[in-house]
Design a protein with these regions (language model features):
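N-terminal alpha/beta PP-like core and its mobile active-site loop of ThDP/TPP-dependent enzymes
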Residues: 1-227, 231
Length: 234
């Protein structure tokens, strides 16, 4: 699958060494699946202290920690393996954020439930229709609409759809810093970037005067507002 990453580590030292990068992936909306090999089920149940573990044995400690830096986390057992793998992978694909799966040594050899797990990937058609109509009405009634693209267009692998939307609507477009290169910079309705601290009167004028700002995939952080301008830095 294009645009996704994966890493495999051992429990404890391995996963903790990688945890900083996983947290960074969450902050930057990067889809990475962290697969961690942990000791066998009996070792976990008996709280046997083996290498790479804390002396007060808790094989779930790192799993609990990863819940705070991933979109979904699972610790597999015989009873939950199929359901949890499907749940975590669904979140992985849908949200494009890092996820975590701890896999005990003996899980692969266990017989697990073959009960079918189904997830509904279909949008609520009525809600989708109502929202689409409201958005279309807002855009069609606008006198000075502007499209502003950003990071999540890239993260959700939607550049083609974004470019088609810009070209079909013929609405002037700009972007935040992380949305650079979403469309060709020589496109006739491209206003240039709208970045904090970098003066671009054309983009600033359009954004400040618009009556309909169409923000596509925005990530609002202090970087958008707080950088000093070249004039101030000088």
């Amino acid at each position: 699958m294009r645009g996704y990453g994966a890493l495999i580590t051992t429990y404890g030292v391995g996963e903790l060494s990688a945890m900083n990068a996983i947290a960074g992936s969450l902050a930057e909306n990067v889809p990475v699946i962290s697969i961690v090999g942990v000791p066998a089920t009996k070792t976990i149940e008996n709280k046997t202290c083996v290498h790479h573990n804390f002396q007060d044995v808790d094989y779930h400690a790192c799993y609990e920690a990863h819940k705070h830096v991933t979109a979904a986390a699972a610790f597999l057992t015989r009873d939950n393996a199929k359901m949890e793998i499907d749940r975590v992978l669904k979140t992985f694909v849908k949200e494009r954020k890092p996820v975590y799966i701890a896999v005990p040594l003996d899980i692969a050899k266990m017989e697990i439930s073959d009960k079918e797990v189904s997830y509904d990937w279909i949008s609520d058609e009525e809600t989708l229709r109502l929202v689409s109509n409201k958005i279309a009405a807002k855009i069609n009634n606008a006198q000075k609409p502007v499209i502003l693209g950003d990071l999540l267009v890239k993260r959700f692998d939607s550049r083609i759809e974004y470019k088609e939307f810009v070209e079909k609507t013929r609405i002037p477009t700009t972007n935040f810093l992380m949305g650079t290169n979403l469309i060709d910079m020589d496109y006739d309705l491209y206003l240039g970037g709208y970045y904090a601290g970098f003066e671009n009167p054309t983009a600033e004028k359009y954004v400040n005067e618009t009556d309909c700002l169409i923000a596509v995939g925005p990530v609002y952080t202090c970087l958008l507002y707080t950088s000093p301008s070249p004039r101030d830095r000088g």
